[in-house]
């Protein structure tokens, strides 16, 4: 199997999640500058309106995680007040608009996934630490225990990177 001409095995071995995401979205692997910009843009958008927590806690802890995640993802649009553009009428703004939406999703979905997991397990909710790598942050948000120093597990980070 191949993604945009690259074998999945090569990508799993030599690229991280954000590089593969960039490849799938834009059709080519990112340059260092493109990847650095993507990472910085994700970090800048890694805040979720606190009112989304109210929606999350309204679900029973026993509710299916995918149903909760789907609902929270749908609710993000209510907290995204920027101008909407028509993607059927070409205005020249489509690329920037789509890039910004993609960045927002890449920034917010890991937080929502971690929140759903942590809520289901009775743990406090966290925004994570985006000074770490993307996948490292996801695993920390999910598995860090309150009042304990988080120790990164490279096996879990590597497995998560390949799964994503």
Where is each model-derived feature located?
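Hydrophobic alpha-helical bundle cores within soluble ligand-binding/oligomerization subdomains
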Residues: 1-164
């Amino acid at each position: 199997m191949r993604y945009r001409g690259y074998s999945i095995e090569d990508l799993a071995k030599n690229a991280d999640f954000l590089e593969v995401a960039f490849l799938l979205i834009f059709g080519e692997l990112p340059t260092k500058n493109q990847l650095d910009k993507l990472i910085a843009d994700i970090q800048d958008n890694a805040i979720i309106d606190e009112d989304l927590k109210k929606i999350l806690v309204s679900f029973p802890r026993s509710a299916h995680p995918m149903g909760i995640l789907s609902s929270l993802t749908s609710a993000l649009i209510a907290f995204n007040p920027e101008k909407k553009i028509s993607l059927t009428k070409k205005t020249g703004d489509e690329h920037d608009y789509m890039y910004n939406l993609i960045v927002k999703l890449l920034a917010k979905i890991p937080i929502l996934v971690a929140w759903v997991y942590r809520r289901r397990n009775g743990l406090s909710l966290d925004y994570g630490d985006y000074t770490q790598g993307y996948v490292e942050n996801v695993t920390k948000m999910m598995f860090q225990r309150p009042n304990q120093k988080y120790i990164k597990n490279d096996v879990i980070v590597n497995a998560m990177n390949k799964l994503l």
